[in-house]
Amino acid sequence: MRIVRGKWAGRDLTSPNDFRVHPTAERVRAAVLDLLSPDLKNASVLDLFAGTGALGLEALSRGAKRADFVETRPASLHALKANVAALRVRDCTRVFKRDALPFAGALTTAGAYDICFCDPPYESRMLDRVIEGWQVTHFARVFVAEHAPGHELPRGGKRFEYGETVVTIYRAPKPPKVVPTEPTPSA
């Protein structure tokens, strides 16, 4: 596994020897980050269920400003920290050894992040719970969900299929424009 594009293109990433970890395939990662290209410059990124950190690190390679990673599995955390160290990005990353559900649930500020990647184990329904929370708070302007083809998500996202992997991208609604009104003269 390696970084596909950007300033670290071709750099290898460490991956844990754990059958429960399914890193996002390079071609899927490349396609998704290409779709997000206009959103990446100076973006703050959240990588939930981060695993190796490949999605967040790819975003940094392509111009994101900072990335936070949330992961609980020891083997994945070890690989993630090794990848952060190898790319020398400790100054613009934070690694949280936390459960992603309560972490995301604690995010109450709209737009706390520009982009959120969410890639929980396919067999779980944790993604549904994170999306429910995101739909209430919109803690990221763009929410990227990776899931199995048979996992139906709420409407409102744009769905992209890559074989046995589906990526659905949601965008937070833009706040209404406030148009200043001219003051009316008093009589």
Region spans (language model):
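Class I S-adenosyl-L-methionine-dependent methyltransferase catalytic core
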Residues: M1-A187
